[in-house]
Amino acid sequence: MPADSFGVFHARRTLDLPAKPDRFTVHVSADNRYRLYVNGTQVSSGPQRSDVTHWRYETVDLAPQLHAGANVIAAVVWNWGRRHPVAQHSNRTGFLLQADSPREAAANTGTGWRLYRDSAYADLPVTNRDISGAYYAAAQGEAVDGARYPWGWERTDFVDRDWFTVPVADAGANVGQVHLHAAPGRGGYGDASGWQLEPRDIPPMEESLVRFASVRRTSGIAASDGFIKGGAALVVPANTRASILLDYAKTTNAYAVLETSGGAGSTITLTYAEAAVDSAGRKGNRNDVDRRTVRGIHDRFLPDGGERRRFQTLYWRSGRYVNVDIETGATPLRIEDLHGIFTAYPFVERGRFASDLPWLADMWKMNWNGARIGAFETYMDTPYYEQLQYIGDTRLQALISLYVSGDDRLMRQAITHFDDSRIPEGITASRYPSELRQLIPPFSLVYVAMVHDYHMHRDDSRYVRQYLPGIRGILDWYGRYVDSTGMLGPMPYWNFVDWADRWQRGVPAGADNGHSATISLLLAYALDRAAVLEADVGERAMAQSYRTRADSLRVATRTRAWDPARKLFRDSPDSAAYSQQTNVLAILSNALPQAEQRALMERVLADSTLIPASYYFSFYLLEALEKVGLGDRYIEQLAPWRGMLALGLTSAPEKPEPTRSDSHAWAAHPNYGLLATVLGVRPASRGFRTVRIAPKLGPLRSAEGRVPHPRGDIDVALTRDGANGLSARVTLPAGVAGRFEWNGRSVPLHAGRQDLHF
């Protein structure tokens, strides 16, 4: 089958076992994806998304589902073909199951397996009308014809005698190994062009039942909440057209599960959307559905008339609303059940924040929902439209993960993938995995900051050290573009920094034609962080060279781009544009003395003529706020998030209205800020070996929360006493010490509980 052809395949292997095994470990992978079953029960899905030269496999113990006698190991494998998601790499359609030891070798893929190409499936392309012309890079829809589907194919009682024997197309190889035992037609002399296999390094994705909250609207039929609760079937008469709008009550990711009986000749179409839109395509309040329609990606199911037929989408969909369009033929249709199987990376909400300002709790819930559904096998910018792991988004998402869940595995995955994405010149791709290469050089600088984030929060210098060659390559690449002025000259590729309204394509003045103060300062910011990484692993000379380069950029940018009359940095020396972004980076990169930074920050907040930071770049603005000692103004900067709640949003959007995406986890960063700035918990030294707690309560009278730490949990409870006093209860994990700061006073902290009064 050509590598760019859509196809769905079922594979089966029957095993006779003399007794139930204690252990039966296999390694399994596929291209593009698979679901694995043992005796009808799902035991694995994957593979973890990556690229062909780092192709992942899962390791699974099948023993719990095996028994004495006949057993069936079965898999569904699919290839999206030429309309694959942009994040999906592929070599060609394939499936591999390899025993861990000789005793399980009978399960190995080979001639003992039987295969069936399922003609029931077709892909449903997403059209411009479906997504209002927006950029779309995720999976297409699916159409499934129940009359052609091999019902029960995964069960032991299914007869597969008409299926064909599986041909061996290739031999797998681990990363670093070549095909020394090549399949027929392969050379076997250093050939590493196929799948280079690596073990999965993240846990299985969460999969759990999720039901709709309500039926919002019907036409052509009456429908109560009974059938979406699983308690009663919905009967649709013959020759009927009906439509039902269902609401999950929040944006979610889920595989659609539809169970039908009867209804031969019927068609059921599920359309998924984050919001209902009016006749002009406007979203409005996300709770409103009156006189609004739902457009988006859709799946189509054609029942064959059998009883209790269970359709499930191969891949998950994202959205809040699902519109169910039904057209029956000559026989009635029973919808026995319709629900979702929620899926996401299995983050656990260990961190928490509570205060005497109730709406902050609602914001926390909204942001955490967005962070959850923005994380699968990679971080994703938007689970609905793209499902791509961008560096700019991922840095913020990873900090949320560290502070709310304490789980760093998806962050490590991202750091590794971005390093894998580097081009020979040195910089990373903007996003990865991505079959379509995109280059945003400023994101390579954000990557340096992300590795520094990991270094400050995890005591793992060996891990960090392996990424220093890549960081050096990035900074060397940038060094080639610093011209005689000491600033960056004209820069290639897409120099996106922020979705600022007055920046074309998000690119600041001077980026393309030379002397961008914005990107020159971002480079200084990255060099400072790289210097810390180098110094902490003992590379002092390299660290000093980075500090020297950063100092040179700071001096050149201040000399050429500082406006002494307005006391602001221009976006470039030859530009009349002034932005929050450039001046925030001036603070974060120390482009002016510490004593002058607070006044600059106050001007940034007060001057309404500046190009404003977006939801994404407001993270950097809020970090600058904390840096200059204005953290007490943090909560007042969250007015846009309160506005999101008023719009009925259940996850933070990509940008202010009109927005394409209603779920963009880069805008969920205030959950990090509530813990790191308002509660005040930050690393005081690399590896989070010590902690600094410097709360900035602003208008709050009380706040309490928890931050997961590698050694345990950090618990903080704060209550104001009068105008300037504070009572604090702090509990640190064993082996962790630090300092607590309040109103100019600093006191030591030790492991365990301590009660402080200021």
Language-model segments: which ranges?
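Active/binding-pocket-proximal capping segment
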Residues: 34, 43-45, 418-419, 470-473, ...
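C-terminal capping/lid segments that line or modulate ligand- or cofactor-binding pockets
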Residues: 134-147, 386, 404, 447, ...
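Active-site acid/base region of carbohydrate-active enzymes
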Residues: 103-127, 321, 329-366, 372, ...
